[in-house]
UniProtKB/Swiss-Prot annotation:
Originating gene: mev-1
Localisation: Mitochondrion inner membrane
Protein name, per record: Succinate dehydrogenase cytochrome b560 subunit, mitochondrial
Coiled-coil residue spans: none
Cofactor-binding details, from the entry: The heme is bound between the two transmembrane subunits.
Ranges facing Mitochondrial matrix side: 140-147
Highest classification ranks of the organism: Eukaryota, Metazoa, Ecdysozoa, Nematoda, Chromadorea
Entry's Gene Ontology BP terms: defense response to Gram-negative bacterium; determination of adult lifespan; innate immune response; mitochondrial electron transport, succinate to ubiquinone; negative regulation of response to oxidative stress; positive regulation of response to oxidative stress; response to oxidative stress; tricarboxylic acid cycle
């Protein structure tokens, strides 16, 4: 009689059982499709043959303030979150802090007009995202959504107030910079 340890037999038995179950449960790609999946696949192939995009494309929609503000709200939120993530990780890993970074930029001695443009590019999305977020909170409370005219008025108001506040911030920072130069 051959003396084989039971642990080996158990392992071999488990392996053969596993391989048998995998061998019988494999389904080919064509068999795995349900009728609705087949319909969807045929529909997509037909659309591709007609040279249509898979999903609706921005070029087929008429530009409207509502979806443009909503899109800019999402984009500005993602850009700000990404900036905070990359900046936070950068300042955590690199051997410099925010003050050193600002002093490095100031060392370039850029004219006020150039820094004003960059400050506006930074300030406008932050203010817009904040004000439009408040507007959307009002929409969540069902305030002003029943009248499309109100929706457009609030959208233009948010856009205009954001532009004015961002401009005021930039003008204030340039005035503070010129005062600091005069006192130095």
């Amino acid at each position: 009689m051959i003396n084989i340890p039971t642990s080996i037999l158990c392992r071999l038995g488990a392996r053969s059982a596993i391989s048998r179950s995998f061998g019988t449960s494999v389904v080919t790609k064509s068999e795995a499709k349900t009728p609705i999946q087949k319909f969807g696949w045929e529909y997509l192939k037909k659309q591709r043959d007609m040279k249509r995009p898979i999903a609706p494309h921005l070029t087929i929609y008429q530009p409207q303030l509502t979806w443009m503000l909503s899109g800019f709200h999402r984009i500005s939120g993602c850009v700000m979150a990404g900036t905070l993530l990359v900046g936070g990780l950068g300042f955590a890993v690199l051997p410099l802090d925010f003050t050193t970074f600002v002093e490095y930029i100031r060392g370039w001695n850029l004219p006020c007009a150039v820094t004003a443009v960059f400050k506006y590019i930074i300030a406008f999305p932050i203010i817009f995202h904040t004000l439009n977020g408040i507007r959307f909170l009002g929409f969540d409370l069902a305030k002003g959504v029943d009248n499309i005219g109100q929706v457009y008025k609030s959208g233009w108001l948010v856009f205009g107030v954001s532009a004015v506040i961002a401009l005021a911030i930039v003008i204030n920072s340039c005035q503070n910079k010129s005062k600091a130069v005069k006192t130095a």
